[in-house]
């Protein structure tokens, strides 16, 4: 807000980038790894204000290049990855991540084409559905088979022919329960929570796993035996890979029972259909298509964002154009964790002979 006031007070057409370096304080629940996650840390924050999107793009890439040079000169082995914008918002973000086994960022990377993204942001390439004749929908007795592995072993079925269900409850701005959500992915997949909340259009902290009994009373689901057929009073989110699948196995919403012959479109449909799964190692790269995706961990040392007009509109960061009209700035924001960068350097360059005099 202070920087917005500085820029807005000039009331002129002038693209600019401002920065600040200051100590910040956070009520960190689990401080750990020295300077990596502490309650007190030093940050460098930059903000760009441009008259149009083209100018914002230039400012963004200027900061991108500057961060590359900074971390290279620091001697870091780092990777630039596409990142989720998270609560900050905006249209695009890149994270600068120093590779380290103690890092909290999970990364997906293609060694062939260079595609890289945080695991929460990484796109998936859907497998093509198997073409076969639709079978009759049947309810099958499957006693004690509450996990995907249990039911697939019991029915002698490939796990890729099963449907996994996860049940959630979402909250409104007053943190009152808003609605139940059931997310469905193929049995060998995991739900990507960031993709799910983005699909729902809610903040990450507005969702949690539902109480099975409470949700069952409203929707008809049964813990361990939940499936998409016949669910009521809940939002159904279906992973895009399930579209077109036939003869799948899913919970029957009845204790000790599953449905076989489940076909998308005939037996159920999603209220929301999109990619909500985690990109696994060895899967196809979303950019070049080669099945060589690798996972690694990294320390987030910097991140940059294209914010657009999200904050400039709400904070009335205007400039006067050539005709004297009020126009909204296109904003970008850019941050480097200075103390975290120091810790990342130590993590990558330490040995048994390291002492404080060498730092």
Task: Give, region by region, the residue ranges found by the protein language model.
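Single conserved hydrophobic/aromatic residue that forms the stacking wall/gate
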Residues: 1-8, 13, 357-358
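Acidic/histidine-enriched segments that form metal/cofactor-coordinating
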Residues: 17, 25
């Amino acid at each position: 807000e202070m920087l917005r006031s500085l820029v807005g007070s000039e009331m002129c057409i002038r693209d600019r980038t401002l920065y600040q370096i200051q100590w910040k304080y956070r009520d960190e629940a689990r401080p750990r790894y020295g300077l990596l996650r502490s309650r007190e840390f030093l940050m460098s924050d930059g903000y760009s204000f441009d008259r149009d999107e083209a100018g914002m793009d230039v400012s963004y890439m200027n900061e991108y290049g500057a961060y590359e040079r900074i971390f290279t000169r620091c001697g870091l082995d780092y990777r630039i990855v596409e990142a989720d914008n998270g609560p900050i918002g905006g249209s695009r973000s890149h994270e600068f991540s120093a590779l380290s086994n103690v890092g909290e960022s999970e990364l997906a990377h293609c060694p062939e084409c260079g595609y890289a993204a945080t695991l929460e942001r990484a796109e998936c390439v859907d497998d093509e559905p198997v073409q076969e004749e639709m079978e009759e929908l049947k309810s099958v007795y499957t006693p004690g088979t509450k996990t995907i592995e249990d039911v697939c072993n019991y029915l002698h079925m490939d796990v890729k022919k099963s449907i996994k269900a996860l049940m959630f409850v979402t909250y409104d701005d007053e943190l009152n329960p808003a609605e139940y959500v059931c997310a469905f992915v193929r049995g060998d997949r995991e739900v990507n929570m960031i993709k799910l909340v983005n699909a729902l259009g809610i903040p990450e902290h507005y969702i949690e796993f539902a109480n099975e009994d409470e949700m069952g009373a409203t929707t008809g689901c049964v813990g361990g035996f939940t499936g998409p057929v016949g669910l009521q009073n809940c939002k159904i989110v279906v992973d895009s890979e399930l579209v077109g699948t036939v003869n799948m196995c899913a919970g029957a919403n009845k204790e000790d029972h599953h449905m076989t012959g489940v076909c998308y479109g005939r037996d159920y449909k999603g209220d929301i259909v999109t990619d909500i799964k985690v990109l696994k190692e060895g899967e196809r790269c979303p950019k070049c298509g080669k099945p060589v995706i690798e996972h690694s961990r990294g320390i987030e040392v910097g991140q940059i964002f294209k914010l657009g007009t999200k904050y400039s509109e709400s904070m009335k960061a205007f400039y006067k154009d050539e005709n004297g009209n009020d126009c909204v700035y296109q904003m970008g924001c850019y941050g480097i964790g200075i103390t975290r960068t120091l810790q990342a350097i130590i993590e990558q360059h330490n040995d048994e002979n390291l002492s404080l005099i060498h730092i």
